[in-house]
Amino acid sequence: MNATLNSAGGKRQLRFRGDVTGSRVEELHHQQQEEQKQKAPLAQDDVAATPTATPAAGSAQQRLQSGTAETCTNTFYDFFKVEMTRGYMLEHDEERYSARRQKIYSFMRIPRDLERFMVYGIMQCADSFLYIHTFLPVRFVMAVWALVSRTVARIFRLRSSGQRLLSPAEICDLLKGVIWMTVTLIMLLVDTNRVYHIIKSQSIIKLYIFYNMLEVGDRLLSAFGQDTIDALFWTATEPKNSKREHFGVLTHVLFTLIYVFLHSGLIMFQATCLNVAVNSNNKGLLTIMISNNFVELKGSVFKKFDKNNLFQLTCSDVRERFHLSVLLFIVVIQTMKEFDWSITQFCVMLPDCFAVLFTEILIDWVKHAFITRFNELPESIYREYTTSLAYDMTQTRQKHAFSDHSDLVARRMGFIPFPLAVVLIKAIYTAVSFENLAAWLLFLLAYLFAMGLRICLTICALGKACKLMKEHQTERNSSTPSSMTNVPVIGAAAPVSAAATGGQNHNNNNNNNNNSISIGSKPAQVTTLLTPPSAGHLDVSKNFSRTSIASTSTPKKAVSEQELDVTNSLELGATALFSNSDVDLDDVCLNEQVTNTNTSSAVQEVYQEQDLVRSQPDLMLLNNSGDGVTSAKAKKATQRLPKRTHKRSESEPGMPSMVEKGGAAGIAGGNQTTQL
């Protein structure tokens, strides 16, 4: 009976032999004995070859055994001591830890850069909002006066019938004033006190759901409203000779009135809900409304954002913050009117208003900090956003702008001032009585204060815009030379006459046409000169060719037109940073005039970019160097090919030439020459 046992990592065969007197176990190490017999001659040869190996091996074995014995004798105290005294070498991963530290610093700087953009965006929103209350009534009165006076002049034939009664700007001002006053008069018929008590009688859950529905509706109407207003303005000011495909001006006026009325009613319900939450004895509704911002944080942080998406989100946050500030101002007016303008009630409700506004600001900080952290966006991106708003500001301050500033702000941030202005006028009209002269004097002072504030905001915003544009253009001017590293910089060389320059150009072109580089076993070495040689000592062997601008691909221009104003050429429009659809990649080329602003205007010369050495012979050129029939076929095939819109890569061969070359005789590779 045989069995197998594992002992000391080896296998032993045990045979049990039975006899008459009892049993005896014999251990038979067959495999071990055979292995020892096989290894014995080899070990003797090794010992004879290296007699000093045995003592060294013995000492190593002794050290191993002693180390094993020491390891076996380690205690828990030794383990605890090693864990308590273990060292750290952080400098071995210095780059990773430095990057982590910079990310933390960038995370902490995000609120500062975000608030700079927020302040500038709120300035533009306030400028557009105050325009409705200050300058629009004056422009509306001027438009009405122009309409009446010009109509009377046409009746008495003091004005020709071919002239338009109103300019496009006057038509837009007239329509804005009519819409604003009509919706305001309709909203004054709504009883705000009854709406307040109806909302207050509802449960907290119903009010929470209703407030969320109002927020969603506000965003949807803001996205839809500006298109309605733009359609009305274009329909009213469209030229008569153009093809009219619309419903008519009255239909668009009706659409716009319905939109402004619905949006104004929605904002009125928002202000009433916020008023109930602030003035209620149970602060549960206010707490739920504040906690609603954290739901927005959850829905925004864990999404992927790029520069354009983050810009839209940031502009939406600017609009929401300004919108919330105006709503809180309306709530304060309504509450103070109910408590007879008591300063005690103002001090009671002020902390709640600050809590709502501070929560909105804090959520914006955390949201943008984590969005930039997760999407690897730098904090300097908010400066680019501010620069884009600066270009919007300057574009609408021209004498004949394409649109009103409020319209452009609405398109950029989704802020439409008309509904919010209607609700504010309703709140002020119901809170203040105009029964005596003092009230009208206070109203006049308030109007003058609002106009002065709007003028100050315009001056500050426009000055900030000019400063940002100047800094942006300076950065672009400083970065323009670095983007043209392949073009050698022409230094202040010795003056050369036009005749000498023309002679040198002719000689250089002839020399370059006669020279060729033979491609052998070793590739040619290309040397790039950072500083070009002077005009009088130009080395032809460097393979530089000099040609005038008239021989380049750019069209010829007069000498007066060749002067370039770098500052004016780098000015961008409203969508300068984010409008990639305006660039045609097929027409992109290097503007030689940028590099020649310091040269003479008579004959301007540049160094052409040095050709690259190909990794293999030019198959098109080799095909042309063959017999005449094959070359003619290749030319015809090349002419039939469609025009390429992009460059072929250096290692990409010409496929038609390879097909035509298949029937021709082989060409020796060692004697081929390619002209660069």
Swiss-Prot record:
It is found in: Membrane. It comes from the Eukaryota. Pfam families: DUF747. GO terms for cellular component: ciliary basal body; endoplasmic reticulum membrane. Residues 1-44, 625-676 are annotated as: Disordered. GO terms for biological process: positive regulation of cilium assembly. Keywords: Membrane, Transmembrane, Transmembrane helix. InterPro entries: Tatp1. It is a multi-pass membrane protein. The keyword Membrane applies. The chain crosses the membrane at residues 128-148, 170-190, 249-269, 346-366, 414-434, 437-457. Residues 24-38 have a biased composition (Basic and acidic residues). Residues 633-647 have a biased composition (Basic residues). The keyword Lipid biosynthesis does not apply. Belongs to the TAPT1 family. This is Protein TAPT1 homolog. It comes from Drosophila melanogaster (Fruit fly).
